[in-house]
UniProtKB/Swiss-Prot annotation:
Organism: Schizosaccharomyces pombe (strain 972 / ATCC 24843) (Fission yeast)
Molecular functions per Gene Ontology: RNA binding; structural constituent of ribosome
Protein name in the entry: Large ribosomal subunit protein eL19B
Other remarks on this protein: There are 2 genes for eL19 in S.pombe.
Compositionally biased residues, Basic residues: 164-174
Family indicated by similarity: Belongs to the eukaryotic ribosomal protein eL19 family.
Quaternary structure and interacting proteins, as annotated: Component of the large ribosomal subunit (LSU). Mature yeast ribosomes consist of a small (40S) and a large (60S) subunit. The 40S small subunit contains 1 molecule of ribosomal RNA (18S rRNA) and at least 33 different proteins. The large 60S subunit contains 3 rRNA molecules (25S, 5.8S and 5S rRNA) and at least 46 different proteins. eL19 lies in close proximity to the binding site for eukaryotic initiation factor eIF4G.
Function: Component of the ribosome, a large ribonucleoprotein complex responsible for the synthesis of proteins in the cell. The small ribosomal subunit (SSU) binds messenger RNAs (mRNAs) and translates the encoded message by selecting cognate aminoacyl-transfer RNA (tRNA) molecules. The large subunit (LSU) contains the ribosomal catalytic site termed the peptidyl transferase center (PTC), which catalyzes the formation of peptide bonds, thereby polymerizing the amino acids delivered by tRNAs into a polypeptide chain.
Record-level GO cellular component terms: cytosol; cytosolic large ribosomal subunit; preribosome
Pfam families: Ribosomal_L19e (PF01280), Ribosomal_L19e_C (PF25476)
Keywords, in A-Z order: Cytoplasm, Ribonucleoprotein, Ribosomal protein
GO biological process: cytoplasmic translation
Length: 193
C-alpha cells in the first residue's frame, strides 16, 4: 500500500481542515499517490476521490433525559450535591423571585380594580416586610381584607340606618309631645276664658 502522508497533508491544507477529517477513496489509491501538488489535490477533490468528512455531532440526548429526570426530582439527593444550599440556590435569588411574583400580582389586581391604591400600598409594604410566604397567602389575605371591609361597611350601614330610625322616632315623639302640650295649653286657655 502506498504512503499517502503527503497527499493527506496537502488535502488538509486545501480543504482547510485537520488531517483526520480527510477521506481518501481506498479504491483509487494509485491515482491519489501520483498527486504531488495542491493543484492535483484540488482536481481529486473536484472528482470526489478526496472528501472532507462531516463534523461529528455531539448528542445532547442523554443530558436532556437527565434534565427531564431532575425536573421530576431524580438524581438530586444528598450524595449528588457538591455546594452548600446557599451556593446551589442563593437566598437572595429566592427572595427576589418571591418579591417579583407578589409585586406583579399586586400590580395586576390594582390595574384590574380588585384592590384600590391604598390597599395596594399597604400590601406592597407588607410583602416587603416578609408577611406573605407565597402568592396563595397574599391572595387569601386580599380576599379576607375585602370580606372584612365589606362586613365593616355593612355594619356601618346598619348602624347608620338604626341611628336614622331612632332619630326619626325621637322627632316623632317630640312632635307628639309638643302637639299634646299645645292641646293642653289651648284647653287651659279655653277654661280660663
Amino acid at each position: 500500500m502506498a504512503n499517502l502522508r503527503t497527499q493527506k497533508r496537502l488535502a488538509a491544507s486545501v480543504l482547510k481542515c485537520g488531517k483526520r477529517k480527510v477521506w481518501m477513496d481506498p479504491n483509487e489509491i494509485s491515482e491519489i499517490s501520483n498527486a504531488n501538488s495542491r493543484q492535483n489535490i484540488r482536481k481529486l477533490v473536484k472528482d470526489g476521490l478526496v472528501i472532507r468528512k462531516p463534523n461529528l455531532m455531539h448528542s445532547r440526548f442523554r443530558i436532556r433525559k437527565t434534565h427531564a429526570a431532575k425536573r421530576l426530582g431524580r438524581h438530586t439527593g444528598y450524595g449528588k450535591r457538591k455546594g452548600t444550599a446557599e451556593a446551589r440556590m442563593p437566598s437572595t435569588v429566592v427572595w427576589m423571585r418571591r418579591q417579583r411574583v407578589l409585586r406583579r400580582l399586586l400590580r395586576k389586581y390594582r390595574e384590574s380594580g380588585k384592590i384600590d391604591k391604598h390597599l395596594y400600598h399597604t400590601l406592597y409594604l407588607e410583602a416587603k416586610g416578609n408577611t406573605f410566604k407565597h402568592k396563595r397567602a397574599l391572595i387569601e389575605h386580599i380576599q379576607r381584607a375585602k370580606a372584612e371591609a365589606n362586613r365593616t361597611k355593612l355594619i356601618q350601614e346598619q348602624q347608620d340606618a338604626r341611628r336614622a330610625r331612632a332619630k326619626a322616632a325621637r322627632q316623632r315623639r317630640a312632635k307628639a309631645v309638643e302637639e299634646k302640650r299645645e292641646q293642653i295649653y289651648t284647653a287651659a286657655e279655653k277654661i280660663e276664658e
